[in-house]
């Protein structure tokens, strides 16, 4: 499947218009979930959460794997995705990228969820004492990745 070029002023990543049937069932299935909170710990509802990731072989350009999803948090601030565990792209460790959009934010927030603490150029750029905030907690086949938008334990966010 070929990706269509888009204008420079749009947000990426860019995805194909259609995905093959069963496109997300090409690896070990996992659930990624978490809670999004604000400075005082209150849950935020109706936050738009987008993810994008590599396939099980670490490729982002697999036409048989969509590699992305979008969800909104519920009244308790919870989001959920069913996906596969990604492989490690060249020069990186396995990860899932997140984009957060919320009414009142002046810009989108981007972060990355890792499955372990290990050498990675993005993770290594985060101060060591804050790196654990980017590692999901595993609970069976569920990976919990809570996001705090502000405060002492604020999730590290990256410039786009």
Task: Report the location of each language-model feature.
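Beta-strand-dominated extracellular/periplasmic modules and repeats
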Residues: 1-160
């Amino acid at each position: 499947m070929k990706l269509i070029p888009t204008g420079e002023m749009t947000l990426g990543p860019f995805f194909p218009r259609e995905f093959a049937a069963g496109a997300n069932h090409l690896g070990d299935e996992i659930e990624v979930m978490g809670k999004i909170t604000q400075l005082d710990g209150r849950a935020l509802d109706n936050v738009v959460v987008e993810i994008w990731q590599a396939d099980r072989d670490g490729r982002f350009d697999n036409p048989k794997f969509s590699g992305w999803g979008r969800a909104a948090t519920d009244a308790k601030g919870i989001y959920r995705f069913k996906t596969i565990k990604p492989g490690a792209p060249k020069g990186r460790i396995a990860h899932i990228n997140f984009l957060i959009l919320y009414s009142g934010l002046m810009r989108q927030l981007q972060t990355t969820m890792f499955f372990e603490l290990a050498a990675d150029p993005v993770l290594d750029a985060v101060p060591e004492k804050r790196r654990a905030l980017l590692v999901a907690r595993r609970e069976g086949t569920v990976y919990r990745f809570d996001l705090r938008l502000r405060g002492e334990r604020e999730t590290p966010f990256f410039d786009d």
